[in-house]
Design a protein with these regions (language model features):
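A conserved glycine-rich beta-strand in the N-terminal activation segment of trypsin-fold
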Residues: 8-32, 54-59, 82-84, 110-113, ...
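Active-site substrate-binding loop(s) of clan PA
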Residues: 22-23, 59-61, 78-107, 188, ...
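Active-site loop architecture of trypsin-fold serine endopeptidases
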Residues: 13-15, 43-46, 80, 100-115, ...
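Short conserved beta-strand and strand-loop elements enriched in small hydrophobics
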Residues: 7, 45-52, 99-101, 285-291
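Catalytic-histidine neighborhood of serine endopeptidases
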Residues: 28-68, 74-79
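N-terminal activation segment of mature serine protease catalytic domains
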Residues: 1-26, 33, 44-45, 69, ...
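Terminal peptide-recognition signature
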Residues: 5-7, 21, 31-35, 58, ...
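C-terminal recognition in membrane/secretory proteostasis and scaffolding
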Residues: 59-60, 73, 160-162, 195-306
Length: 306
């Protein structure tokens, strides 16, 4: 509980937004804090507030929108609580969970604890990686919980009944005009977050492979706008709109108008899913694409580049 902090996103000295984070590691006199990237995105400076109400300036070591993880650091000779890391893999559906955070108004409701269960595992949820648009362009594999999660909880720990962190709360589904939704919150599995955090702490570049194409989902209304037709028997996949010169796609033989049906035997249902599968690979890996070109299926091998 005492390892949880309020994260303050400041721009020009003015508070823009608040979220939650937690101290997860200490090395010598350096403490490391984990939070969501979207909590600190756009900040010119970041502060954290501890459970003893002490406020500290922190350094942003790194992060990115696809992992939605950011790592902060500060130096201190004082002793602060460090969260115990658990296992999302060992968590079972129905297990008790606790979310700790600073929902809604961090000045009033900081360090609120809510209780729920693990409602599901390995949920594939579409997300937007840009604050400029709400359209989904990526997919995250997450834990599902019915523990109450509200604005401001983002970046806080989702814990098991032993108080060990099994995930980082990062989003919830909300009601709209067509559906009434309650108790559907999500958390990034702690194993994924720690793996990313260690890369940041070790000074590794966070680079992701690229095909070097622009694309549209087959279901997109944009295909009609660009006067692009696909074979009637092709109902899933993404259409290649353009191929960059010198790109991995061009080297591997992808052409404008090709429809990507599968990547490494995984059926491609959207460009968001294709990107998710692509980013599971490293630069230099070879992938296998099944495509439809002018009504005929074809298999291509492509070596991934930056």
């Amino acid at each position: 509980y005492d390892s949880v902090v309020v994260v303050e996103n400041l721009k020009g000295g003015e508070l823009q937004a608040t979220g939650t984070g937690f101290i997860f590691k200490k090395s010598d006199n350096k403490y490391y804090v984990m939070t969501n990237y979207h909590v600190i995105n756009g900040a010119s400076s970041v502060k954290i507030q501890l459970t003893n109400n002490k406020e500290l300036n922190v350094e942003v070591l790194g992060g990115d929108s696809y992992s939605d993880i950011a790592i902060l650091a500060f130096e201190s000779k004082d002793d602060y609580s460090i969260a115990e890391i658990g296992s999302s893999t060992d968590a079972r559906v129905g297990d008790t969970t606790f979310a700790v955070g600073a929902p809604v108004d961090s000045t009033t409701y900081s360090w609120s604890v809510t209780r729920g269960i693990v409602s599901g595992k390995d949920r594939m949820v579409k997300v937007s990686t840009s604050s400029q648009t709400s359209s989904s362009d990526y997919i995250m594999k997450v834990l599902q919980t019915d523990a109450a999660i509200n604005s401001g909880n983002s970046g806080g720990p989702l814990c098991n009944s032993n108080g060990q962190v099994i995930g980082i709360t990062n989003m919830k589904l909300v009601s709209n005009s067509t559906s009434n939704i309650e108790g559907m919150g999500f958390a990034i599995p702690i194993e994924d977050a720690i793996d990313f955090a260690n890369k940041i702490i070790n000074g590794e570049d966070i680079t992701r492979p690229t095909l070097g194409v622009s694309m549209l989902d087959i279901s997109s209304t944009g295909l009609a706008y660009y006067n692009i037709s696909v074979p009637d028997n092709v109902t899933n996949g993404v259409v290649i709109m353009s191929v960059s010169k010198g790109s991995a796609a061009e080297e591997g033989g992808l052409k404008k108008g090709d429809v990507i049906l599968e990547i490494d035997n995984v059926k491609v249902t959207s460009s968001a899913l294709l990107k998710y599968e692509l980013y599971r690979h490293n630069i230099g890996d070879e992938i296998t694409l099944k495509i439809n070109r002018n009504g005929f299926e074809k298999t291509l091998k492509i070596k991934l580049t930056k």
